[in-house]
Amino acid sequence: RPRAALCTAALIAAPSLVNLLVVIEPLLRRKLGAWTLACGVALPAWCLGWLAKTALTDPGILPRLARDGRTSSMRGKTRETTVATTGRTTTTRWNDTCGYFQPPRAHHCSVCNDCVEKFDHHCPWTGTTIGKRNYRAFLMFTYGTTALCAFTMTTCGYSVSYRGLKKSGAAIAVFFVAFVAFVF
């Protein structure tokens, strides 16, 4: 699992570093250079921080119950039960793997093999399941990477228009990487 988050961190850090050293550095002599430099440092740091928070925070994994024979006693019986929560009636499902009826909005992650509260999805970029406890961090990571991609494409586009195509090979390459990341 940590390998996915490390690969994502490298995919954020490498183009950001090239953007800082090759694209933004020549722009420092321009009027907006200091602000561009500040954003060029702050946005990747923001993304990497929220990536780490997302990947390292427990998504809301529900502990498994000890095997006491109850699982085998559920065979052939009703696999769902109705539960009243906050004035609403909800149907919960029996989970053979974890040995209990899942709480409302909890689902079993097939990749991690755990039940997760308010399961959203298993994210291949962070290498973890997104659930109740790391959903906010994941959203902040997503917003940050979107802003970083837009910022990188803007600085690269400005660099190409300012310096010309012949002197902007690295800017074009970084723009392409940021564009693919933005679309993906």
Feature-to-residue mapping (PLM):
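Intracellular leaflet-associated regions of eukaryotic membrane-associated proteins
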Residues: 1-184
